[in-house]
Swiss-Prot record:
Top-level lineage group: Bacteria
Compositionally biased residues, Basic residues: 59-71
Lineage: Bacteria, Pseudomonadati, Spirochaetota, Spirochaetia, Spirochaetales
GO BP annotation list: translation
SUPFAM superfamilies assigned: Ribosomal protein L4 (SSF52166)
Gene Ontology molecular functions: rRNA binding; structural constituent of ribosome
Subunit structure: Part of the 50S ribosomal subunit.
Protein's recorded name: Large ribosomal subunit protein uL4
Role description: One of the primary rRNA binding proteins, this protein initially binds near the 5'-end of the 23S rRNA. It is important during the early stages of 50S assembly. It makes multiple contacts with different domains of the 23S rRNA in the assembled 50S subunit and ribosome.
Annotated keywords: Ribonucleoprotein, Ribosomal protein, RNA-binding, rRNA-binding
A Pfam family the protein falls into: Ribosomal_L4
Amino acid sequence: MERKVFSKDGKEIGTINLDDRVFNIEISHGSIYNAIKNELSNLRVGTSSTKTRSEVRGSSKKPWKQKGTGRARVGTKRNPIWIGGGIALGPKPRDYSYRLPKKVKRLAFKSVLSLRAADENNFKVVENFNIESGKTKDLALIIKNFASFNGKVVILLGNDDQMIKRAGKNIRDLKILSFNKLRVVDLFYAKNLIALESAVNKLNEFYVK
């Protein structure tokens, strides 16, 4: 599958081949769902904590005798039914992270790349460029040629270019990702995807294996 390649000024300068085994497969919505769920679960801190009846402050003495008062029987004022008592079945610190099978993860990446590549208006391949100044305004001028800033924008890099990443730090709703550090959730929810030529070539090699 071929796509147009644009200069950083927004002019068409050629074409590039997108490997069908990466950018044009049958989309697996199930794998995308599982990958997003996995990524979001791995981000959870899991520090929520409540006190049980054994941890709350207060005496464990029986408030009144079992029989003869006409009141309901109670064993301790730390009972979960009482105000100030412990919490029954409340959350405790836990680890929400889990591993996703490698094949499912790879299928999810290829599926989401195929989903995005199918929309030519919101998926652009751009020639490799540098932001030597590291200034936000220089990167913003390039992005405006391909995307509006009324939604999430993702830029895919072929390498870990720190100057481009530095320039994009102050741009709202912008994610700059290296080809080998992608997240399905970022690609799926991006309104516009801008891929540098080097990123496309690396993805062609990386996911065909």
